[in-house]
């Protein structure tokens, strides 16, 4: 397996000259910015000493505010205060309305179906909102470092798809930032812990943030970080704990009107405060909307237990994908503020059979890892031997004849990666080829996900199988896919970059993987049948062309035998008997052997006509 050296040519800094770089943890609930100073990675605080920046933006006609100031307006001006925008990244409006029906914002759809949020500052998309958060973080870094940033590394959940990753990059560019790389959040945490403590072996990174959950199984060895498998849920996090507790408080308080956005915000604020308090106390008193009551940690644990169980199921799947057992995991790294919840730490410890690591602040560990990576990529550590491997979550491939999927890059392949396969034409004189890019684990197109289509035109008109088309799949370090098709004799090519308008949920990814295992035997049989049908069609197509050109080489009796064999093959190819189709193909081959030999002799005679033996 190839390893990726994380240092780019041309970026090495001059002696005694350091470039300014930052790592940004663009979180659902809170965001942070970190940098490396005097050889140590540290998060940067605001003027009041606060390291976290709430991922909240409040919009007004004359401007906007970000962070704590914006969050104070959430209850007063809910419609213009955008929070948890990370959940909206790369999703269509229909998808958002289905997933998050209780959002207090008014939406409109853009021409391509993407969401536009109605605010006092006008219609804004999630990319713009994210850009405003990034600008605030960049301003903090610029002031702390007394200079403009040369580049940033921004972290994203491991399960972010192409559209979500591209949206993050677009937001950074809109904020005026040079993106060195997008980095998976669990991988960033592994960098922070791997470099600080020099561990080797298999570790699990359990990342439960405000809005997303990721589990990564990594192997650390001599500065090499290899992601063995990933899993998670992009719609599960501490926010869900908050909403469950808010609903519980609402029921206890007898507050019926859920549509009152202001009351809902007060309930949510009370729930957040109670959750934090219950991490350190056995019970907490809650005051909201004129109601006062007490909530115990036991009650809170009962509410969130099903969600914690969901995270552990994802852990089990990731371990299976990685091919390791829980007792092989040497350490468990806890990432994200929600891992402070005692029940989470307790259940994770029980699952892996060891207390999880919490020596680095779980809120800061991702930003610290991103800062270390940014410092290397910007050229401040040209001698670094650190390597980093990420993986793709689902296999990538192409549709081939018969509705089959030919996998080009298997799932859990490390990225960046480039793989190529050669394909050919099916029919005589074929001058174009449709390239259908697929994603999934099943054998048939109907059971996989369509990513993109494009056409390669200008193929030389040759007999079937005469043209050779090389299709190259390239996944870059940010997980974005480019597909290029090139006809090898002419050099004509076409390509596409996959940027779906919205992506799969993590539960859908898990379901696709599960289905591939459940239907493995059935899929293999279906593939064998489809392949035989394609071969039958190819044989009949070739035979039809040969008869049209050289039927005169056959006697009437010989022609009848061949026609009967072809008719039988055509008939059985409509059925589902793989063996019968295979035998019928062999019979056609047998009955046409003499015909093929005569055609070859005739071609040779034509080629030699008019030439002497000496010329040959």
UniProtKB/Swiss-Prot annotation:
One of its GO terms (molecular function) is unfolded protein binding. It holds the Pfam family HSP70. It comes from the Bacteria. SUPFAM superfamilies: Actin-like ATPase domain, Heat shock protein 70kD (HSP70), C-terminal subdomain, Heat shock protein 70kD (HSP70), peptide-binding domain. One of its GO terms (biological process) is iron-sulfur cluster assembly. InterPro entries: ATPase_NBD, Heat_shock_70_CS, HscA_NBD, HSP70_C_sf, HSP70_peptide-bd_sf, Hsp_70_fam, ISC_FeS_clus_asmbl_HscA. Keywords: ATP-binding, Chaperone, Nucleotide-binding. Belongs to the heat shock protein 70 family. NCBIfam families: HscA, PRK05183.1. Chaperone involved in the maturation of iron-sulfur cluster-containing proteins. Has a low intrinsic ATPase activity which is markedly stimulated by HscB. Involved in the maturation of IscU. This is Chaperone protein HscA. It comes from Escherichia coli O139:H28 (strain E24377A / ETEC). The gene is hscA.
């Amino acid at each position: 397996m190839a390893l990726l050296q994380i240092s780019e040519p041309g970026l090495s800094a001059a002696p005694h000259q350091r470039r300014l770089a930052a790592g940004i943890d663009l979180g659902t609930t809170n965001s942070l910015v970190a940098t490396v100073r005097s050889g140590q990675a540290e998060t940067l605080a605001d003027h009041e000493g606060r390291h976290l920046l709430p991922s909240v933006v409040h919009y007004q006609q004359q401007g906007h505010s970000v962070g704590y100031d914006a969050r104070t307006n959430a209850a007063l001006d809910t419609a213009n205060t955008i929070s948890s925008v990370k959940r909206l990244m790369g999703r269509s409006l229909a998808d958002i309305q289905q997933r998050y029906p209780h959002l207090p914002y008014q939406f409109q759809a853009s021409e391509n179906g993407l969401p536009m949020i109605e605010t006092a500052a006008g219609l804004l998309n999630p990319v713009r909102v994210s850009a405003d958060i990034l600008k605030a973080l960049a301003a903090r870094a610029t002031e702390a470092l007394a200079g403009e940033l040369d580049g940033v590394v921004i972290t994203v959940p491991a399960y972010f798809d192409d559209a979500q990753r591209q949206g993050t990059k677009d937001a950074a560019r809109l904020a005026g930032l040079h993106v060195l790389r997008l980095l998976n959040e669990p991988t960033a945490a592994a960098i922070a812990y791997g470099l600080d403590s020099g561990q080797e072996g298999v570790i699990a990174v359990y990342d439960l943030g405000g809005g997303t959950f990721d589990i990564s199984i990594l192997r650390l060895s001599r500065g090499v970080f290899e992601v063995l498998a990933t899993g998670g849920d992009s719609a599960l996090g501490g926010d869900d704990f908050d909403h469950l507790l808010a609903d519980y408080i609402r029921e206890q308080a007898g507050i019926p009107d859920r549509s009152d956005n202001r009351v809902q915000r007060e309930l949510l604020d009370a729930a957040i405060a109670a959750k934090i308090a219950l991490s350190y106390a056995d019970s907490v008193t809650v005051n909201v909307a004129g109601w006062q009551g007490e909530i115990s940690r036991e009650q809170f644990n009962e509410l969130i237990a099903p969600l914690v169980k969901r995270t552990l199921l994802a852990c089990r799947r990731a371990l299976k994908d990685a091919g390791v057992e829980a007792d092989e995991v040497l350490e468990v790294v806890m990432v994200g503020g929600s891992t402070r919840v005692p029940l989470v730490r307790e259940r994770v410890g029980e699952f892996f059979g060891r207390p999880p690591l919490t020596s680095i602040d779980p809120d800061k560990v991702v930003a610290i890892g991103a800062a270390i990576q940014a410092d290397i990529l910007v050229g401040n550590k040209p001698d670094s031997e650190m390597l980093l491997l990420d993986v793709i979550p689902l296999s990538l491939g192409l549709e081939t004849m018969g509705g089959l999927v030919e996998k080009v890059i298997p799932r859990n392949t490390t990225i960046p990666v480039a793989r190529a396969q050669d394909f050919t034409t099916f029919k005589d004189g074929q001058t174009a080829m449709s390239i259908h890019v697929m994603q999934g684990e099943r054998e048939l197109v109907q059971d996989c996900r369509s990513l993109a289509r494009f056409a390669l035109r200008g193929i030389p008109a040759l007999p079937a199988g005469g043209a050779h088309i090389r299709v190259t799949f390239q996944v870059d370090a940010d997980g974005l896919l480019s597909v290029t098709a090139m006809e090898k004799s002419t050099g004509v090519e076409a390509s596409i970059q996959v940027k779906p308008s919205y992506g799969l949920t993590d539960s859908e990814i898990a379901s696709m993987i599960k289905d591939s295992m459940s239907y493995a035997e059935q899929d293999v049989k279906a593939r064998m049948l489809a392949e035989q049908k394609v071969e039958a069609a190819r044989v009949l197509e070739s035979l039809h062309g040969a008869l049209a050109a050289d039927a005169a080489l056959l006697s009437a009796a010989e022609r009848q035998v061949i026609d009967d064999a072809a008719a039988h093959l055509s008939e059985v190819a409509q059925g589902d008997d793989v063996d019968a189709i295979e035998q019928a193909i062999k019979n056609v081959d047998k009955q046409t052997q003499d015909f093929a030999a005569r055609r070859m002799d005739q071609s040779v005679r034509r080629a030699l006509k008019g030439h002497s033996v000496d010329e040959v």
